[in-house]
């Protein structure tokens, strides 16, 4: 019965089409399969980018589609680059990026180093550590909003237990000083497991015979760590920093859930400011210029970083 089905399928396939496919070169067949994907990428990514660039030179407003659209040249870009509020937003974003990356790399590598050393309950501990990464930012935001509650939040009571500061005397989300750190803590809790997994992959890729040779040469554990482990794991660490840096630069949902950009503008990151300009103030041309500036910034920094990463890999 199976043979009869195959025979019917073979008869249903036009012989001329089969001959044409067999007559194509490998390169031509590759283009046949790749072309739909390229067209899809052009439609989803390239065309909107070109359209955004065009809008950035106009005064277009999406809530006034019938209004006259005027060409304003570089005025939008000039206003953005000379606006002190924009630079304050950039500073808040840089603060968030620096501390989240620092904490995630240090804690993530430390956890990877711990888990790489086999012990009882290793698999269970790994599963528990990875759990936060599996949650959505909205869930994490709600979870930490509850933890930060001055009256009933466990975070405030933990601070009181270790420092003696009354739990009700401070608010992580309502304080201008503490609000940025509340986001750093929540994001670190959520994404440190990602860095840990990448570092763990790097640690487990190091052959055992390298450490055995070091033991024969009587190299101390400290020297093995700094001269062997760190250099071999460094490309993995840099890759984790690249991924997390790009994602944190685009951070939106977790911040909106926790602080909404407040209090004041202390946690107003570039992504939130861009959303306000585009969909609350409806300054589409201005926000398009802002988006292009952010795109060029991220693309430029990522390109420089990737070159540095490639040099590290070539060592």
Language-model segments: residues:
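Short, Lys/Arg-rich, polar N-terminal cytosolic tail immediately upstream
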Residues: 1-24
């Amino acid at each position: 019965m199976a043979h009869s089905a195959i025979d019917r399928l073979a008869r249903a396939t036009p012989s001329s089409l089969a001959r044409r496919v067999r007559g194509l070169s490998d390169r031509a067949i590759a283009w046949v399969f790749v072309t739909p994907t390229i067209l899809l990428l052009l439609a989803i990514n390239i065309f909107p980018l070109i359209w955004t660039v065009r809008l950035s030179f106009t005064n277009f407003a999406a809530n006034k589609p019938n209004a006259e659209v005027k060409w304003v040249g570089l005025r939008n870009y000039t206003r953005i680059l000379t606006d002190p509020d924009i630079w304050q937003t950039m500073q808040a974003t840089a603060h968030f990026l620096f501390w989240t990356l620092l904490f995630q790399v240090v804690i993530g590598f430390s956890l990877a180093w711990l888990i790489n050393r086999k012990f009882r309950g290793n698999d269970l501990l790994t599963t528990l550590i990875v759990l936060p990464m599996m949650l959505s930012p909205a869930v994490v935001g709600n979870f930490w909003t509850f933890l930060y509650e001055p009256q009933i939040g466990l975070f405030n009571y933990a601070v009181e237990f270790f420092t003696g500061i009354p739990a009700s005397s401070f608010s992580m989300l309502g304080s201008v000083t503490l609000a940025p750190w509340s986001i750093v803590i929540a994001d670190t809790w959520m994404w440190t497991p990602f860095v840990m997994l990448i570092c763990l992959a790097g640690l487990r890729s190091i052959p055992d015979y390298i450490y055995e040779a070091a033991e024969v040469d009587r190299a101390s554990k400290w020297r093995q760590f700094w001269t062997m482990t760190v250099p071999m794991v460094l490309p993995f660490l840099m890759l984790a920093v690249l991924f997390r840096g790009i994602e944190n630069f685009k951070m939106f949902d977790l911040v909106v859930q926790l602080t909404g950009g407040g209090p004041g503008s202390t946690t107003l990151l570039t992504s939130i400011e861009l959303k306000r300009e585009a969909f609350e103030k409806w300054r589409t041309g201005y926000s398009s210029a802002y988006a292009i500036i952010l795109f060029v910034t991220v693309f430029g920094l990522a390109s420089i970083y990737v070159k540095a990463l490639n040099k590290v890999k070539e060592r």
